[in-house]
């Protein structure tokens, strides 16, 4: 189950965008071997809202493009398919039968700014940020160079499947 909640009014959100986001998330999770019913919440917000969240949770006083709040625990360098592929989740891990993977807060305002800066479409940027965040929910990171290379490769492979290029 994918929940999308639009809590901003600076960028128009249409059904096409919401459907593409859901399609990208579903595809990415299948590619990453998530073989259980899941729940992810995506909240579309503006720069002021994401700045406040950054300040509250990361002690960073600026707007960023996307934030991920994973619900599962991962050791450094491990991702979902490494440790949870055949894991027996118990009822305390599930919400109405769905594994709660986490929440995504995405600034559509920042996505629009970055799409112009990088010279590609708003849809491509929003899909990229969604994939990036989903991979974080699955344990991927980019703090170390080797992890960054792996994460970027996965992002590009998924984008390519949807014919979304830079």
UniProtKB/Swiss-Prot annotation:
Protein localization: Cytoplasm
EC numbers on record: 3.1.-.-
Stored Gene3D superfamilies: Metalloproteases ('zincins'), catalytic domain
Pfam families (alphabetical): YbeY (PF02130)
GO BP of this protein: rRNA processing
Lineage top rank: taxon: Bacteria
Chief localisation class: cytoplasm
Residues that coordinate or bind Zn(2+): 132, 136, 142
Comment on bound cofactor: Binds 1 zinc ion.
Cofactor or coenzyme needed: Zn(2+)
GO-annotated cellular components: cytoplasm
One Gene Ontology MF term: zinc ion binding
Keywords of the record: Cytoplasm, Endonuclease, Hydrolase, Metal-binding, Nuclease, Ribosome biogenesis, rRNA processing, Zinc
Family: Belongs to the endoribonuclease YbeY family.
UniProt function note: Single strand-specific metallo-endoribonuclease involved in late-stage 70S ribosome quality control and in maturation of the 3' terminus of the 16S rRNA.
Protein name: Endoribonuclease YbeY
Organism: Clostridium botulinum (strain Kyoto / Type A2)
Origin organism lineage: Bacteria, Bacillati, Bacillota, Clostridia, Eubacteriales
Gene (name only): ybeY
